[in-house]
Regions:
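Extended, compositionally simple hydrophobic/Ser/Thr-rich segments
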Residues: 1-81
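Intrinsically disordered, low-complexity terminal regions
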Residues: 49-276
């Protein structure tokens, strides 16, 4: 566990951590954090750009703002792997408040256009050395998700990539292509699925064999015509890679919401499995 106590007016970066990060009695601070578990207690006026594999928890906190960890540098990918963390398992916006105040909210999400460099000014080139730091969302190792509170329309789409040794690259390719559209990526998750869960999510046993190959990567999209856009993009990627049977895309708006609920509910109640 990494514990940060009694900090005031600090900027703190905590790189990929296999265990938990615990903030206590911090005020007017800004954090960049990647961890398995996150908790804050007795903190106030704190901004946190977070990548957390499990649900973040706050207790007796006030005016805490959360944003998606959108950052990159040369060694970050290896650090994720060494910490056994998946770049697709980020619950940054799904906050549990142990001590909610009636009529008030102790936490909020940072504005969608919040830029990390405005909170964490980059050091001088002399101090940076060859770190190759990038702070724009398009260059981030962790994809920018908009969180469970953001919505553009009533249409949703679930995209699931099955393990074949290239699932991560194909998922990132789809995310990159859809960044050029008006659709938004709400959530991502990398988990193992059993046959029973697979049938409940997809409504068929047709995927029972492929889910046994390893973790699947699920993406939740929202936006007008997001289903048709996801289908077209996934088809183009499948055609170019020759892996036409290793991706699932919702085809019906009426069933997509239920599929998304089943997929992410299953992920929330089961232990996250990551590749070491």
């Amino acid at each position: 566990m990494i514990t940060v106590d009694d900090c005031n007016g600090c900027n703190i970066f905590i790189g990929p951590t296999k265990g938990s990060v615990f903030l206590r009695d911090c005020a007017e601070c800004r954090f960049l954090i990647v961890c398995q578990q996150f908790r804050a207690r007795d903190c106030k006026v704190v901004d946190i750009f977070l990548c957390c594999a499990t649900q973040p928890i706050i207790e007796s906190c006030n005016d805490i703002r959360f944003g998606c960890f959108c950052y990159n540098y040369g060694a970050l990918e290896d650090q994720f792997k060494n910490a056994c963390l998946s770049i697709f398992n980020n619950n940054w916006s799904n906050i549990h408040d142990f001590t909610p105040a009636e009529g008030e909210r102790n936490w909020s999400l940072l504005p969608k256009d919040a830029r990390i460099e405005d909170f964490f000014p980059l050091p001088s080139p002399e101090k940076l050395g060859d770190l190759q730091i990038m702070t724009d969302p398009q260059s981030s190792l962790v994809s920018q998700t908009h969180g469970c509170l953001q919505r553009l329309s009533m249409q949703y789409c679930l995209v699931v990539f099955f393990a074949d040794g290239h699932a991560q690259n194909r998922a990132l390719s789809l995310i990159k292509e859809l960044e050029q559209t008006d659709n938004i990526l709400l959530r991502t998750k990398e988990i193992l699925l059993e046959e029973e869960a697979s049938e409940r999510i997809f409504g068929t046993n047709a995927y029972n064999k492929v889910v046994k190959r390893g973790p699947v990567i699920g993406l939740e999209y929202n936006g007008k015509d997001c289903i048709s856009m996801c289908l077209e993009t996934a088809k183009n990627i499948a055609t170019s890679t020759g892996c036409t049977g290793l991706v699932y895309v919702s085809t019906c708006p009426k069933t997509a919401r239920k599929q998304i609920e089943n997929f992410f509910s299953h992920a929330d109640v089961h232990k996250i499995e990551t590749k070491s």
